Amino acid sequence: MVVKLPLHDFYPEGSPFKTENFTVKDPTIEDEDRLFNPDRIKGGYALDDFVRGLLPEEAQRQYGNMFLIDRNFILYAVRVAMFGDTIEFRENIECSHCGASLREATIDSEVFIPENRKFELKEGGYFIRFKLLTVSDQNVMRKDPLMKSNFLTRTLYYVIDTIEKEGSDITDKYALIRSIPISLGTKIREFLNTQYPRFDIFIKCGSCESTIPFEMNESFFWNKL
């Protein structure tokens, strides 16, 4: 199948991902083995093993440079191509909006790419430039021992490319991030929600048509969740 990666324009020249027509092979039973390998699931690598196996050879070699949004987009596109856009639940779930009991739902997605592609925030004497997270970034974050105890500051450490504070001679990025005022932290979250690329997956309630955020993991590829 051929997909258009949401962030294809953001890759450097020569990247195998910088194309509007990116080829993904149809999954086989061998690919399914990778997806449901219990050891790899436990380590958090099963989804990456699965996606990498679907890519052309050069893209496999540069898989770590793929943006997370594009990886998730491929997972979504493959799932819909395999099973359609309807998800059945093993047990009824309740719509958080209207309280309806759902046995199945329609899955959908939305890509948001802001017009301003610099991803820069100037606020409160700080100048912050954000970057797009890659598969390699996620793998480093997964191994970071501080992620559990310092989730917010460590997440910002990876999503922030550079940070400067007016009048400060501190150059250590993490030290500057830890000194960010709470009021600026609110501005950063607002910026990331409105001025930073997103790929959201959600299900639609058949009763009230409301959308419910949907988390993607290995079970995303089962016929019934």
Describe each PLM feature range.
Residues M1-L225:
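Short, surface-exposed, charged amphipathic helix/loop patches that serve as local interaction elements
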